[in-house]
Amino acid sequence: MDSLRSNGAPIHVTAYDTEGSVLKVREALTDTAFRKHNAIIAPDNASQLAILAEYGKNNNVKVFNTFLVRDKSYLTNPSVMHGNLPSALMYRKATDALMERLSYSTPVFVSFKGENGDKAEFVSALKQSLTDKGNTFMNIEVDGRLESADLRALPTDGNYTFIPTSSRQADLNRIMPGIIEWRDEAVTPMVRLFGYPEWTTFRGETLDNMHNLNTTVYSRFYTHEDAPRTHDIDAKYKKWYGNRMENAVPRQGLLGFDTGMFVIPYLLHEASSYDGVQNGYFFTTAGDGAGSYNDALYFINFRPGNIIEKSRI
């Protein structure tokens, strides 16, 4: 609220504890004070969201779905604002953006013998895009752990983007040391690593190796812990509440901050975009008679020297 005082209008925020109960939600809808609100930030429960979405549709009240990524009510309800880029659209957008970056690089897909990677859908879509455009790519299947010897067939004057078929940290740790060793031995090749939203949670040696390999990942959100805006909000949070904000991924405190910083100006000025500390909001209409969804997606580049760059796709 402290950051929203300059918006030029009084702000009234009410919090309701649904207690995980549909009955509590229905009870809230009968409250005279509740019916004066212009927007609802819905809870993380599908049944409760459905009730609120129907209320929003019948009363011309925007219902903001921040938590339920797989919910599809925005497709048929003009009052629902879907706060996350839907998965199918996320894969397509990430694939299209990556294709531009692969213009001068050979993609090398790395998988493990006898193991199914958890990113088969994304990898399949990317390979299809490469094939459609006539771009070549390579597949390397390794047994247990990638060794530098597994890469010796690659010309050392090449430019390569390694793409694991798994997002799991244990699998990434079985891949990166071998790539680093091969690159350092070969001296000349240009090497990058491309990966997944889950990688933004990795720390320690895994993160160090990601920086070493100039790694880029796609993600709906990211918090740069050392950014001045992050430090400023952390300091204000501790001042107001006495404790440090919970450090999770995503950070729920920052999610609340960014959501408030978007929703209030949206109600006042119909602003459809906001580039937040952690979450960005760039809404687009899903079609005639439909609601809208958040189109925000980012590339996070972990560069050598512990440099982190966040850019909107």
Each language-model region and where it sits:
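Extracytoplasmic ligand/sensor domains, especially the bilobed periplasmic-binding protein
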Residues: I41-A42, A46-S103, E115-F122
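Structural motif
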Residues: P10-T32, G144-L154
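Segments of small-molecule ligand-sensing domains
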Residues: N243-G253, G260-R312
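Signal peptide-proximal N-terminal region
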Residues: M1-V13
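Extracellular/periplasmic periplasmic-binding protein-like sensory domains
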Residues: I175-G253
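Glycine-rich, charge-decorated loop segments at or immediately adjacent to ligand/cofactor-binding or catalytic sites
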Residues: Y74-M81, L146-R152, W199-L213
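Extracellular/periplasmic Venus flytrap/periplasmic-binding protein
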Residues: M81-M176
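Periplasmic-binding protein-like
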Residues: R35-N45, F64-T66, T106-K113, D157-M176, ...
